[in-house]
């Protein structure tokens, strides 16, 4: 009989800050929550910050901690507010295209797949409409 992997379900991750620069929009999450998640799973991402107009067309990333003593981005709209012992993991859609800031709406929830080992954060509730 084969081994079946179980992907955990029922996790909630809430954004706690946002930083923008010329190349991307970075959402922060609570480092304790991120570390408590399993290596792979599905979670509900609650977006609680508005993306500035300048970040609407920029790729989105989520800042995840790389050690136990770091925090993530703050509510400031400047990259200088970031704690630099984090790693920005790009957010992609189901077909591995970068998600842009205008897709991340304050006060909404998004379903996401994450794999901490491979560095994957993929929104599962959006898709690319085929050109017709």
What kind of region is each of these model predictions?
Residues 3, 23-25, 71:
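Aromatic-residue detector
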Residues 37, 47-132:
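Acidic, glycine/polar-enriched metal-coordinating patches/loops
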Residues 1-18, 129-132:
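Short, intrinsically disordered N-terminal pre-domain segments
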Residues 11-40, 50-56:
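Surface-exposed ligand/attachment interfaces on beta-rich extracellular proteins
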């Amino acid at each position: 009989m084969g081994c079946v992997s179980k992907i955990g379900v029922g996790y909630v991750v809430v954004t706690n800050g946002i930083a923008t620069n010329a190349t991307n929009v970075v959402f922060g999450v609570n480092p304790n929550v991120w570390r408590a998640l399993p290596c792979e799973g599905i979670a509900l991402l609650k977006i609680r910050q508005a993306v500035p107009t300048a970040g609407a067309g920029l790729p989105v990333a989520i800042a995840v901690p790389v050690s136990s003593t770091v925090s993530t981005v703050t509510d400031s709209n400047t990259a200088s507010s970031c704690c630099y012992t984090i790693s920005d993991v790009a957010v992609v859609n189901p077909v591995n295209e970068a998600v842009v800031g205008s897709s991340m709406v304050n006060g909404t929830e998004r379903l996401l797949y994450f794999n901490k080992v491979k560095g994957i954060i993929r929104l599962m509730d959006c898709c690319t409409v085929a050109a017709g």
